[in-house]
Amino acid sequence: MGAVTARRCVEWLLGLYFVSHIPITMFIDLQALLPPELYPQEFSNLLRWYSKEFKDPLMQEPPVWFKSFLFCELVFQLPFFPIAAYAFFKGSCRWIRIPAIIYAVHTITTLIPILYTILFEDFSKAIAFKGQRPENFRERLTLVGVYAPYLIIPLILLLFMLRNPYYKFEEKRKKK
């Protein structure tokens, strides 16, 4: 597989990631931040099912720090998703490099406390988490599996933007 083909495969993966992230953010994640009357009952039921099935305490009773991440997702990330999807599906858009690096670093940074909380929080003693919560290590790993793609794909994006020779190269404009 040639370098161009490999680059296009990664760009398509990233494009699919950003397209899929739009409805997940709008219809699931932001329910923990926005007023409930904005959402039809079907979406509320979907969130309730997810929260109970995966025992996600962050989505059942979101702590303030988690809501701050959701606010950033609404204000900064959601507007970026269609732009990034366009750039990666179109391909060869060098202008996406810096915004993609900023997005990747921001997302990776927010996932670290989320994953740390899921793995190490003593939910039995934590007063901030009142709903269902993971009770054993297997349930914690299942929940980590839900969040892990939002760490892994941005990490791939970051490395791709930093290491791929096509995106590292800056074209110098000719002076007239």
Swiss-Prot record:
Statement: the UniProt record of this protein carries the keyword Transmembrane: yes
Gene Ontology MF: a single term: oxysterol binding
Protein's membrane topology: Multi-pass membrane protein
Residues at which cholesterol binds: 75, 77
Main subcellular location of this protein, as a coarse class: endoplasmic reticulum
InterPro entries reported in the protein's UniProt record: EXPERA, Sigma-2_receptor-like, Sigma2_recept
Subcellular location: Rough endoplasmic reticulum membrane; Nucleus membrane
Cystine pairings recorded for this chain: none
Note: Sigma receptors are classified into two subtypes (Sigma-1 and Sigma-2) based on their different pharmacological profile. Sigma-2 receptors are identified by radioligand-binding studies as a binding site with high affinity for di-o-tolylguanidine (DTG) and haloperidol.
Protein's recorded name: Sigma intracellular receptor 2
Species for this entry: Rattus norvegicus (Rat)
Gene: Tmem97
